[in-house]
């Protein structure tokens, strides 16, 4: 099958060097997986740097960098103004040798893909990766309105939408996307990199809780810090965010630091700053528990990566976490915003090493069996075949 992946940003090295939470890692890894399954894969991304070549190949995948506007990173508003050019360039490249299916990542790429395939009969499959609905609090009113309208348009026009979770499926149907046009295909995890066997970061005598730095306004870390006050034998490591030198000037992290000070736990809360992709599993293996209680997220890759490392997860009973974490088997689910309940569940887990070990073993097994890239790649191809 000739597969075209369309995205705003990706490079041939994204699978190993990009922001671990960015869409570039996911697109590059999916492309490599599809190529390993025997498909002809080309990734199309807007050229965002003068140093970027016209095309390059890596791991059996061809990456083409399409000129559309200035060869620089663009804000959402400026990018929208270049989508017509991006779409026209794609249409010209596909005129003589169209792909069997186009898979767009993020809503802006969906608009470009729909324009490029208009009247050709080539099906477009859409992965949003993130929807604007749970992020409205961090967008301007105008941005939220535009994004909501465009996501609805893309979702209702493409042949198939691949939702990351049951939570995203519900959001999509709320936008008016027909249920029959949606297939749940979660993000995959690299089970070679994220594995229980491997080095772990050094730690002291305290029990370690690991959480991710905020990716949105509704991150739930206030609840975790409040719960820490009732867990005197534990420490909280918040991994990721801006470079270490910028932690003291980051407004979100400083709000959390002030909350930790008021709660009397500032000596037990650590901010790592930006973490390389290779360092993430090292930190995950060092933790007794990975805590992720942002209940609105439609994509649950962070708990999945923790599970793959054999680390049990305490997650929110809402959002994508409910798909990933099997309550009582690979971790526990708690109601978002309840610090007392969170502290109680964490205390119970930390008091039972055998239970914690059993949860970790089951978590790693579930990550390997359900979320390996090989399985996710095959599920994605099945969706392509239904669309084509």
Regions of interest found by a model, annotated:
Residues 1-56, 61:
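N-terminal subdomain of nucleotide-sugar transferases
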Residues 167, 188:
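Carbohydrate-associated surface elements
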Residues 201-219, 225-231, 237:
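Conserved donor-binding/catalytic core segment of Leloir-type glycosyltransferases
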Residues 274, 282-287:
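Short alpha-helical donor nucleotide-sugar binding micro-motif in glycosyltransferases
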Residues 295:
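Aromatic "clamp/platform" in nucleotide-sugar-dependent glycosyltransferases that forms part
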Residues 312-316, 325:
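Short hydrophobic beta-strand element within catalytic cores of glycosyltransferases
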Residues 327-328, 332-339, 348-353:
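Conserved acidic donor-binding segment of nucleotide-sugar-dependent glycosyltransferases
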Residues 348, 355-370:
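A short, well-ordered alpha-helix in the C-terminal region of glycosyltransferases
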């Amino acid at each position: 099958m000739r597969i075209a992946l369309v995205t705003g940003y990706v490079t041939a090295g994204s699978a190993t060097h990009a922001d671990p939470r960015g869409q570039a890692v996911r697109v590059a890894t999916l492309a490599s997986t599809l190529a390993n399954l025997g498909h002809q894969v080309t990734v199309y991304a807007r050229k965002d740097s003068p140093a970027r070549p016209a095309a390059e190949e890596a791991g059996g995948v061809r990456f083409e960098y399409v000129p559309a506007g200035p060869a620089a990173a663009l804000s959402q508003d400026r990018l929208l103004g270049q989508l017509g050019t991006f779409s026209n360039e794609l249409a010209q490249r596909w005129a003589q040798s169209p792909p069997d299916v186009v898979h767009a990542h993020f809503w802006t790429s969906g608009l470009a893909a729909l324009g490029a395939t208009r009247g050709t009969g080539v099906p477009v499959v859409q992965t949003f990766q993130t929807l604007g609905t749970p992020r409205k609090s961090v967008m301007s009113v105008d941005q939220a309105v535009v994004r909501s309208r465009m996501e609805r348009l893309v979702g209702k026009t493409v042949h198939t939408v691949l939702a990351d979770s049951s939570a995203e499926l519900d959001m999509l149907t709320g936008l008016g996307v027909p249920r029959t046009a949606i297939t749940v295909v979660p993000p995959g995890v690299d089970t070679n990199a994220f594995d229980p066997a491997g080095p772990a970061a050094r730690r002291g005598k305290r029990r370690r809780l690991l959480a991710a730095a905020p990716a949105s306004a509704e991150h739930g870390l206030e609840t975790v810090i409040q719960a820490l006050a009732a867990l005197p034998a534990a420490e909280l490591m918040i991994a990721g965010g801006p470079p270490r030198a910028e932690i003291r000037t980051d407004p979100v992290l400083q709000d959390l630091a002030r909350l930790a000070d008021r709660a009397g736990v500032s000596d037990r809360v650590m901010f790592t700053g930006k973490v390389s992709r290779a360092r993430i599993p090292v930190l995950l293996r060092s933790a007794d528990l990975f805590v992720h209680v942002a209940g609105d997220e439609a994509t649950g890759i962070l708990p999945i990566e923790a599970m793959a490392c054999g680390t049990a997860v305490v997650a929110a009973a809402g959002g994508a976490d409910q798909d990933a974490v099997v309550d009582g088997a690979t971790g526990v689910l708690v109601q978002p915003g309840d610090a007392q309940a969170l502290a109680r569940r964490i205390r119970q887990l930390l008091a039972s090493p055998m239970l914690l070990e059993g949860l970790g073993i089951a978590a790693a097994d579930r990550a390997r069996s359900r979320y390996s890239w090989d399985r996710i790649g095959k599920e994605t191809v099945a969706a392509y075949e239904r669309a084509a």
